[in-house]
Amino acid sequence: SALDGYLKDIMQRDMQNFLNEYTGDMILVTHSRDEAYKFCGHLTILDSGQALTTGETKKLFERPGILQAARLTGCKNFSTVQKMGKHSIYAVDWDLMLQTKDVVPDDVTHVGIRGHWMKGASEGGENHMEVEVVEYIETTFEHQYLLKNKKGGDCQPVWWMCPKGNFEEDPRAKVPKYIHFPEEHLMLLKEAK
């Protein structure tokens, strides 16, 4: 963690080469979701010393199933939910009805979506929320917006990340009127017991 980005990338490439040649099992302990994703084909996610879930790394990042596991894999956007139908939920904290690709289980407690998977839109529609900017953060290669449902009230904001086109672009030009929550990227979650 004390290495600069360039040296860390070189070390990680060397580590990947070593792992590609190694034929046995290994255990990698890391607090970096990026390292876990890069180096591990299978993953066990721990919270407070307890195993939350185990499985293929890409599948766990896509569908962690458990709220705490989604947090540990870096998801920032969560809402408590009410099941409304076989493929529909009401996201209480966002004041938003959502249609889901997956069948909604009876024990669902939350929905999550990664900030990189949401899409900006100029018009409303299914799984769209009219938004206003609460906060903006500029990083080297992306814009990060904290967006809130324009309905107001006690709605919780969501993080939306989008790549920069160049270093000079105006971040206000990227702000959409609506944000779209693609149904294929909605994570239906339950709390660990």
Each language-model region and where it sits:
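ABC ATPase nucleotide-binding domains
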Residues: 1-65
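A generic structural signal for short coil/turn motifs at secondary-structure boundaries
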Residues: 3-4, 69, 120
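Small-residue-enriched segments and motifs
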Residues: 13, 67, 79-81, 129-134
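Residues that scaffold the ATP/ADP-binding catalytic core of kinase and kinase-like folds
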Residues: 60-63, 72, 121, 189
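C-terminal boundary and immediately downstream tail of ABC-type ATPase nucleotide-binding domains
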Residues: 62-84, 112
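Non-catalytic connector elements of ABC transporters
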Residues: 76, 87-193
